[in-house]
A protein has these predicted regions:
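Non-catalytic RNA-recognition surface used by pseudouridine synthases
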Residues: 1-83, 89-218
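Single conserved hydrophobic/aromatic residue that forms the stacking wall/gate
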Residues: 219-232
């Protein structure tokens, strides 16, 4: 069952206008499609599939060391226990970090209910929590605990097994899924917590096009020219 308030940004059709008769003066630089791998890696974004365990900063550090880059950042923190899409911005691309972090996100999570709840009541709660919501960051967070406005574009009820509820959530950047599960539990008057979480999308980057650190290491060693093909 799907509860949708509005279409997520990445599903909105966008068109790019191209002047076919235009030419770029070679003195301004190289054709993007003909740039050497060294230049591409000086301003690229790598879509990394973060495993559970390491911090987001540790992933960024590993990528920086592997590529021999001067700096690397990430497009939105994932807690150590959370896996999934983590865009890593390299060198010049770090200037775009804020734009990537503000992009929409999509997660798949397991919410654990603390009591018995009917399907009807659960669906009522999920519908209520779509659209614009108010949210206070969790106690353990890196930002000040003041009320913020966030948008839940869509909540999809994928599966339910007793008190375990599998959800796919599309939301605006800065949404705390852990707090969302807790707030749903408060509304249901039984309590709930986020048991497991995976990020499946961050802006234009999805898990279908993500590479693990092992993938990146093997490509860097055996097929370095492919790095330009998997970067953005």
């Amino acid at each position: 069952m799907i509860f949708e308030a509005e279409t997520p940004p990445w599903e909105i059709e966008r068109r790019t206008l191209v002047r076919l008769d235009a030419e770029t003066d070679p003195s301004y630089g190289c054709d993007p499609y003909k740039r050497p791998i060294e230049k591409l890696l000086k301003a690229c974004v790598l879509n990394i599939d973060k495993p559970r365990g390491p911090t987001s900063h540790e992933i960024a550090f590993t990528v920086r060391e592997l590529l021999g880059a001067e700096q690397a950042g990430h497009g939105g923190t994932l807690d150590p226990a959370v896996s999934g899409v983590l865009p890593i911005l390299v060198d010049e691309a770090t200037k775009c970090a804020e734009a990537v972090m503000k992009g929409g996100k999509e997660y798949v999570c397991v919410m654990r209910l603390h009591g018995e709840v009917s399907n009807e009541k659960l669906e009522e709660a999920l519908k209520l929590f779509t659209g614009e919501i108010y949210q206070v960051p969790p106690v353990r967070s890196s930002v000040s605990r003041r009320i913020r406005t966030r948008t839940i574009y869509r909540i999809e009820l994928l599966e339910r097994d007793g008190r375990n509820v599998l959800l796919r959530i599309a939301c605006s950047g800065g949404t705390y899924i852990r707090k969302l599960c807790s707030d749903i539990g408060l509304y249901l008057k039984c309590g709930a917590h986020m048991q497991e979480l995976r990020r499946t999308r961050a802006g234009p980057f999805s898990e279908e096009t993500a590479y693990t650190l092992l993938d990146l290491s093997l490509i860097h060693i055996s097929e370095p020219t492919r790095l330009g093909m998997i970067s953005y």
